[in-house]
Amino acid sequence: MWSQVLGTLPAPLFLFLAGISFAIVTDKLRQKGLPPGQIARTTIRRGAEILALGLLFRLQEFVVSWGWAPWSDLLRVDILNSIGVSMILMGMLMGLGCWIVLSLTRISRPRLVLGLMAAGMAAVISLLAPLMWTTWRPRWVPWPLESYVNGVHNLNEPQSWLFPIFPWSAFAFVGLAVGFSLLSDWARKHEARTFALAGAGGIGLIYLGRWLNAQPVQLYAAIDFWHTSPNFFLIRVGWLLAILTAAYLWCRWGLAQSGFSPLIQLGQTSLLVYWVHIEFVYGRISILPKHAVDILTASLGLVAIFFFMLGLSLLRTELKGRRPEMLGWFRKPVKAI
């Protein structure tokens, strides 16, 4: 079971980290004294940009796969689409939350209020996911829209390989709640203790989710454990918190302190790395034949793609720093021979 759980974590990690980043941005905007409406517009606009990138990515994949990819692939709800929509939803919630914080002048800990609102939304999305995939399906809307709710696509049934709001956006809201917790005054004063509590809480959630799933009486009549179960959601949130704690240990006392860190470098160019690696792993220029390699060959392929993406990331960082110099070179007047 543990290996299967770990295999489901990349997408939750994307959304979880997007939520943490969103909390940092929202807190900075709030500290600048921006009104709630402007905070909402700024963050929602950024979410719309990510959604637009997701749609552009689908167009690119369709063009690359021209001749055998169906047109419906253009409307697939992929992970970038999910991140964009989740950011739009978080922007709406934070606009409301900041308005509440400003309206109620007695609130002394606004980050706590915003974090609790985010955690509550995560719980609501997770608890509604089994229903939105079954008895509460919005069948009355066109499938391209319903697909953002439950991943139905054009196949008349929710698909496990898509990333709809239910349940995936819940991970972004968990990240949002965790982000506000990490920004609190207490967490900043007791940094190591905060991450230790996060790790311990994560382990507790893992075992709580497993215990709840083992009970003879369940809340839902029909449920898909690996895709919509709130119990599995708790398990994955537990793993995310454990990974967050491990990342802190790595950056505070691990090899990341010795200088260059490949993981930090990849994280600084994560969108580019994601965009490019898809073609090498899943696309037409895949470095390995699909469904036809053993574990050793797949592992070697993983190592190869890791170093290739690391090189690409380093090149991107180098070119980014030299952008003014490169633009100046192109703008130089041509000398007569």
Named regions from a protein language model:
Residues 1-337:
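Alpha-helical transmembrane segments and their immediate juxtamembrane cytosolic regions
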